[in-house]
C-alpha cells in the first residue's frame, strides 16, 4: 500500500483515495441520505477514534442512528438535514483543547472522505441530547462533526491566495508551497481562513492564527496544520514556535 494511503483500511474496506486526493475532494456537506454506515466503515472509524483519543487525550465519540441533535432550530437555520450520525469532539478543559480537536478531528474527517463519506464541522448548529454521549467532570464538548453519505458532494468556495496566508516565494522549498496549498483547502469557520504559515531557516515552519470576531481560530489552526503536514510531508520540516 502506498505511504500516502490511509493505513486504516480493514479487510472488507476498499480505500477509495489518498489523503491528498481526499483534501481535494472534501467539501462541507450539510444534507445527508438515509444510507446507513456499514459495520466495516464503523469499525474503521472507531479504530481511528481510539488512536486519536489515546494520542491526544481526547474523548471523541461516534454517535450512530441519532437524529435529534440536528433537528433543533439552530440546525435548521444552518441548513442541516438527514444527519443521523456524528462525532462528539470532546476533551479535557485545557488551553490547547480546540487546537487538538482541530488537528485530530481533521484526521478523522479525511479518513471518512477516503471511505466515501461526507462531513461538516459544526460549531453551534446542533443540540446536546442527554445520554447520547459521556463526559467526565473535567471535560467539555468543543464541537460536533456531522457524518454520513451526502445528498451531494458539497461545493468549493473562494479561497485566499498563497501570498495572503504565507511567506512563500521563489526561494522557499516546493514542499512549503505544497503544504500551504493543502492548508488553503482545509475547512475553517465560515471559510474565514485566519491563519498564516511562515517558513524560516533550517526547514522550520511557524503556524499562526489570526484575529476573528467569529472565533474558532484555534480550532481552525489545528485543522490547517494537519492539512499542511499532509501536503508538505512531515518528514520535510519541523514546527517552530
What is each of the regions a protein language model found here?
Residues 2-241:
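Acidic, surface-exposed loops and disordered segments
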Amino acid at each position: 500500500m502506498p505511504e500516502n494511503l490511509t493505513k486504516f483500511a480493514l479487510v472488507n474496506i476498499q480505500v477509495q483515495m489518498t489523503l491528498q486526493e481526499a483534501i481535494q475532494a472534501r467539501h462541507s456537506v450539510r444534507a445527508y441520505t438515509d444510507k446507513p454506515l456499514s459495520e466495516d466503515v464503523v469499525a474503521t472509524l472507531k479504530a481511528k477514534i481510539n488512536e486519536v483519543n489515546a494520542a491526544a487525550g481526547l474523548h471523541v465519540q461516534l454517535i450512530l442512528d441519532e437524529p435529534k441533535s440536528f433537528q433543533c432550530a439552530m440546525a435548521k437555520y444552518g441548513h442541516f438535514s438527514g444527519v443521523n450520525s456524528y462525532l462528539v469532539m470532546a476533551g479535557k478543559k485545557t488551553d490547547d483543547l480546540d487546537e487538538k480537536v482541530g488537528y485530530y478531528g481533521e484526521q478523522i474527517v479525511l479518513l471518512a472522505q477516503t471511505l466515501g463519506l461526507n462531513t461538516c464541522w459544526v460549531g453551534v448548529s446542533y443540540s446536546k441530547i442527554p445520554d447520547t454521549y459521556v463526559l467526565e467532570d473535567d471535560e467539555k464538548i468543543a464541537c460536533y462533526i456531522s457524518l454520513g453519505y451526502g445528498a451531494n458532494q458539497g461545493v468549493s468556495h473562494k479561497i485566499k491566495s498563497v501570498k495572503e496566508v504565507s511567506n512563500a516565494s521563489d526561494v522557499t522549498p516546493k514542499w512549503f508551497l505544497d503544504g500551504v496549498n493543502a492548508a488553503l483547502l482545509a475547512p475553517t469557520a465560515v471559510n474565514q481562513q485566519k491563519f498564516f504559515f511562515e517558513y524560516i531557516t533550517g526547514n522550520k515552519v511557524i503556524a499562526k492564527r489570526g484575529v476573528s470576531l467569529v472565533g474558532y481560530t484555534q480550532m481552525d489552526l489545528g485543522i490547517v496544520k494537519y492539512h499542511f503536514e499532509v501536503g508538505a510531508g512531515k518528514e520535510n520540516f519541523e514546527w517552530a514556535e
